[in-house]
Amino acid sequence: MIQMQTTLDVADNTGARAVMCIKVLGGSKRRYAGIGDIIKVSVKDAAPRGRVKKGEIYNAVVVRTAKGVRRKDGSLIRFGGNAAVLLNAKLEPIGTRIFGPVTRELRTERFMKIVSLAPEVL
């Protein structure tokens, strides 16, 4: 469950280490984002020679949350922290590698690239 001011780890090789959610996209009164939702983020910590710089603003898709995701069979998949993958204006991943597991809920037409790059799909 991600809301404004939530800090997230970055699960790709763009050079960003930490980002902060500045807006949950998808409606004017929308408060929370879960796995598979698109948010607007600001880069708070970045590697020196990465693709992105501190202070830049990007779209991102949430790939892991500490709150987890409930499946139809009743099982719950939780993670140790919150993580996102940075996207460009066309909602394509900026990075070429994804670190850590992602969930099967990302297997929509929009995010198949992220699922194919991920080392593990839960």
From Swiss-Prot:
Q: Subunit structure, per the record?
A: Part of the 50S ribosomal subunit. Forms a cluster with proteins L3 and L19. In the 70S ribosome, L14 and L19 interact and together make contacts with the 16S rRNA in bridges B5 and B8.
- What are the recorded GO MF terms, alphabetically? large ribosomal subunit rRNA binding; structural constituent of ribosome
Similarity annotation: Belongs to the universal ribosomal protein uL14 family.
What's this chain's function? Answer: Binds to 23S rRNA. Forms part of two intersubunit bridges in the 70S ribosome.
Official protein name in the record: Large ribosomal subunit protein uL14
Gene3D superfamilies linked to this entry: Ribosomal protein L14 (2.40.150.20)
Keyword RNA-binding assigned: yes
Q: What biological-process terms (Gene Ontology) are attached?
A: translation
Read off the InterPro entries from this record.
Ribosomal_uL14, Ribosomal_uL14_bac-type, Ribosomal_uL14_CS, Ribosomal_uL14_sf
What is any Pfam family matched here? Ribosomal_L14
Q: Which GO terms describe its cellular component?
A: cytosolic large ribosomal subunit
Record key words, sorted:
Ribonucleoprotein, Ribosomal protein, RNA-binding, rRNA-binding
Q: Does the keyword rRNA-binding apply?
A: yes
